[in-house]
C-alpha cells in the first residue's frame, strides 16, 4: 500500500475542501491515487449531503445586501448554532444576499439555479453541506427595488430588517430598522394588519370580556377597546419609538420630514418546529449505527 503523506492530504483538501480525516481516508481507500481519492470524496460528500437534506434546519442567519437602487434580505438555515457561526456558511449567506439584490430571482428555485463559481447556487450549497456535515437551506428572501432609500439592520445575524423610506437623513432609516427589530411590528399601519390576526385578537377579547359578567353593550366596548389597543401595538406607525418614549414612529418621521413606504422583518427559524430528540435514544442510535459499520 502506498504511503499517505501530509502533502497528499493537503493537496486533496485544497481540491475538495473536505475535512482532513475524510481526505486521509479517501487516499487510503484509493491506495494513494489522488484522482481516484478525489472521485471517492465527491461521492461521499454527495451522499453526506443527501442524508443531511432530510434533517430539520431551524438555526441559521439573516443576511442583507444593498447596492444601487436594490436591497435584499435573506434567511439561510442550518441545523446548529455552531454552524451558523461557520465562516463558509456566513460567506455563502452574504453571496446569496448579493445575488438576490443584483439578479432579481423570482423565487428560491430560481435563485438556486443562478450561476455561481462555475456551477450553480444549489451546487455550491450542496458542496457546503458535504463540507460541514449539516443540512443547509435557503428558506426565503425579499428584494426591494426603488428610487427611494433603503436601510437594513441585522441584530446578531438572527434578526434582519429592510426598510424602504424617504427623507434626507440616513439615520432615520437606521433608527426605524433598529426599532422594527426590537418591537417586531406586523404591519406598517393599523389598516395593513392582516384580517386573520384581527379576528383572532377579537375572539380572545370577546372570551375575556364575556367572563366579566358585564352588560352586552359594555362587553362590546371592552372588545373594541382591546382590538384598537392591539392594532396600535402591532402597527409600526403607531408604536412608541424605542429611542424616545415621548414619540410614536409616525411622529418621529413627521418631525424628520421622512416617511416609510414598506419594510420586511425576518427572524431566524420563525415558524420552524425544532426537532426535540431524546438524548438517550440518540446515543443508542449512534452506537447501533457504529456497530453496523
From Swiss-Prot:
PROSITE patterns for the chain: EF_TS_2
Database matches in NCBIfam families: tsf (TIGR00116)
Protein family per UniProt: Belongs to the EF-Ts family.
UniProt KW Repeat keyword: no
Organism: Burkholderia lata (strain ATCC 17760 / DSM 23089 / LMG 22485 / NCIMB 9086 / R18194 / 383)
SUPFAM superfamilies linked to this entry: Elongation factor Ts (EF-Ts), dimerisation domain, UBA-like
Function according to Swiss-Prot or TrEMBL: Associates with the EF-Tu.GDP complex and induces the exchange of GDP to GTP. It remains bound to the aminoacyl-tRNA.EF-Tu.GTP complex up to the GTP hydrolysis stage on the ribosome.
Entries under Gene3D superfamilies matching the protein: 1.10.286.20, DNA helicase RuvA subunit, C-terminal domain, Elongation factor Ts, dimerisation domain
Gene Ontology molecular-function annotations: translation elongation factor activity
GO CC annotations, alphabetized: cytoplasm
Chain residue ranges for the region called Involved in Mg(2+) ion dislocation from EF-Tu: 80-83
One of the Pfam families matching this protein, by short name: EF_TS
Keyword Protein biosynthesis annotated: yes
Protein name, UniProt field: Elongation factor Ts
Localization (cell): Cytoplasm
Gene: tsf
Keyword terms of this UniProt record: Cytoplasm, Elongation factor, Protein biosynthesis
